[in-house]
């Protein structure tokens, strides 16, 4: 794909979940499909008919096994936060249909215990998980998502 081809592509609408433990740490998972260190917070596409909150709760269950009764939704980013994929991976991800993602992020307080987290879901996203402070998350993610995560942590700084 040429740079002009990539520039003409749309962004994929997506949600992200900041699952906060109430003690300054957030859930972070190592991507199952990556051989390199690629830690991230739960995220996924918004399906037809879903709003960001509904999609975020669905993604939470799908990726972490955490039941919706074990969280309290606290906040949502007011605007879409966008990121571009590195050009060399655009053709490989989402069949080359998107240049990146436009995300709405939802902050949830985790009300359960670690035993309520089960990443061995029907379609696993993560091979392992841990609680990390936001600064450590920024050190653990792929570089092209760093700016997004900084904006998200800033948006939720009253809690984190």
UniProtKB/Swiss-Prot annotation:
Motif (Nudix box): 44-65
Enzyme class name: hydrolase
GO biological process: nucleoside phosphate metabolic process; ribose phosphate metabolic process
Gene3D superfamilies the record matches: Nucleoside Triphosphate Pyrophosphohydrolase (3.90.79.10)
PROSITE patterns reported for this sequence: NUDIX, NUDIX_BOX
Family under the similarity heading: Belongs to the Nudix hydrolase family. RppH subfamily.
Record-linked HAMAP family: Nudix_RppH (MF_00298)
Name of the protein: RNA pyrophosphohydrolase
